Amino acid sequence: MGRVYDWFEERLEIQAIADDITSKYVPPHVNIFYCLGGITLTCFLVQVATGFAMTFYYRPTVTEAFASVQYIMTEVNFGWLIRSVHRWSASMMVLMMILHIFRVYLTGGFKKPRELTWVTGVILAVLTVSFGVTGYSLPWDQIGYWAVKIVTGVPEAIPVIGSPLVEILRGSVSVGQSTLTRFYSLHTFVLPLLTAVFMLMHFLMIRKQGISGPL
């Protein structure tokens, strides 16, 4: 093991990277409420892991979606646990995100020079809510169907572009297979990718600027 480590150390300077990560200064005013962002990240990672596991069994079609979810819950080994953890961590992620936003706002963490960190955080909040909207529809039960119908119908009130925008969201004039396909793609590919990118930007800026001081 020593030789393997030395081989990587010679090329990547692993020890220098580890020292930089572990030696970052933490202000004395930092308390448990400053961990809310990290808890949100942890929930996101749990979401990725459990969501990936369910993609092996979930079928994104209007005729098979509900049955595939029932199959996960009743037939797949620990499928009920995986889906339950996915749902619980989703709720926890939203809650932790809201508390994190309040903490940052109340402690002035959005002020100069951390404006861009705040902007990326707001974008991450929008992405988190979008996860909830798209994921809610995937079981394609009565609640999911009507939730999608209502949410995608909201833009119709916008003058001129309302109707075309609704059709883009649904994939057709009415809610159906195209809508489910769009929401599944958003939930499992587009939103996770965007979230990972903006989280990386968010953390790099925090790393560069450090934790904001007390008010």
UniProtKB/Swiss-Prot annotation:
Binds 2 heme b groups non-covalently with two histidine residues as axial ligands. Binds one heme group covalently by a single cysteine link with no axial amino acid ligand. This heme was named heme ci. The keyword Metal-binding applies. It is found in: Plastid, Chloroplast thylakoid membrane. Keywords: Chloroplast, Electron transport, Heme, Iron, Membrane, Metal-binding, Photosynthesis, Plastid, Thylakoid, Transmembrane, Transmembrane helix, Transport. GO terms for biological process: photosynthesis; respiratory electron transport chain. Gene3D superfamilies: Cytochrome Bc1 Complex, Chain C (1.20.810.10). Heme c binds at C35. One of its GO terms (molecular function) is oxidoreductase activity. Its main location: plastid. PANTHER family: CYTOCHROME B. This is Cytochrome b6.
